[in-house]
Amino acid sequence: MALTKAEMSEYLFDKLGLSKRDAKELVELFFEEIRRALENGEQVKLSGFGNFDLRDKNQRPGRNPKTGEDIPITARRVVTFRPGQKLKSRVENASPKEN
């Protein structure tokens, strides 16, 4: 099961008493600000949670798994996430949920 933006909005509605519209807008604005910062080449640091960084990957050789043909994998920029120590610790100490 995954946490969705809709569930985050619902949580803000329940816990903070925001209207459903305001809660949804708050979640959208939060993620839009992260997107904007990354698009502008900025690092995003969320204290107690982790860091979003941009990494440039060089072109490298690859292979088509169906045909075995050599094909180049083009250079690209990727987003990486490094969890902070507090998040790592909480995840490591959490009891696993039964599926």
Curated annotation (Swiss-Prot):
InterPro entries according to UniProt: Hist_DNA-bd, Histone-like_DNA-bd_CS, IHF-like_DNA-bd_dom_sf, IHF_alpha
PROSITE patterns (alphabetical): HISTONE_LIKE
Superkingdom assignment: Bacteria
GO cellular component: cytosol
Chain coiled-coil ranges: none
Chain positions covered by the region annotation Disordered: 49-70
One Gene Ontology biological process: positive regulation of metabolic process
UniProt similarity note: Belongs to the bacterial histone-like protein family.
Role summary: This protein is one of the two subunits of integration host factor, a specific DNA-binding protein that functions in genetic recombination as well as in transcriptional and translational control.
Assembly and oligomerization: Heterodimer of an alpha and a beta chain.
PANTHER family noted in UniProt: DNA-BINDING PROTEIN HU (PTHR33175), INTEGRATION HOST FACTOR SUBUNIT ALPHA (PTHR33175:SF2)
The protein's name: Integration host factor subunit alpha
Organism: Cronobacter sakazakii (strain ATCC BAA-894) (Enterobacter sakazakii)
